[in-house]
Amino acid sequence: ANLLEDLKRRDFTINAMAYNEVTGLVDAFDGIGDLERGVIRCVGNAMERFSEDALRMLRAVRFAAQLGFSIEQETQEAIAGLAGNIKKVSAERIQVELVKLLTSPNPGELKVAYRTGLTAVFLPEFDVMMETPQNNPHHCCSVGEHTLKAIEAVPADKVLRLTMLLHDIAKPACRTADKKGVDHFYGHPVRGSEMARGILRRLKFDNDTIDRVCRLVHWHDDNPELSGKAVRRAVHRIGVEQYPALFAVKRADILAQSGYRRAEKLAYVDAYEQMYRE
């Protein structure tokens, strides 16, 4: 009876199983079934579970991303209904879940946190990116959709994934349109580096992570001329410790853009890296 009471208070059915020598597997909430179906479902009443600890809403998205599962309808509706409560959760706890989500095999699941209203509370700048179009031949979708693709295109490293999350964070603020109606985002890397610093501080990241991410955001669009002298100057200006991470950032950014001149852009990064390594 005590075990059942304990399991009832767990967050999701897949986490509400126990095993002992006498009875074997105790699975009162069909956790095995949900594992087989690939479903994240709350134990009992979802509104109650999320009211007990609002961080569980972000944990649901994180588990879905890590396991490649979907979030069951009632559980997802409860998140949408209670999303505002995540503001009661400490920044440190949100940071831990966000990093696990971003470094998972399916970081694009961040879109579920957007759709359910979670990012509106702890990362409102992301919502603005999702709602900012890019009328430009280099792009085929909103700043936010491009960002999600870029996160997925970079290796699952904390600094790299945070950099891709924030690399275009200032595009909405820097957006201008020329006479032909083409959008431009002049100065967005430098402004973005400042915005990224504010966001990462707000989420209580350590100074080393903040510095590394902000430098990569600051220089992600810097394209030196392909001569030995110019590349050496760039490495000196940007800082040798930003390499070779900067090349991973550049490639992910290109792969998340439209196909316009993609081969040419990738060839440039290859040549830049070759010169850096020489």
Each model region followed by its residue ranges:
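Catalytic cores of the polymerase beta-like nucleotidyltransferase superfamily
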Residues: A1-E278
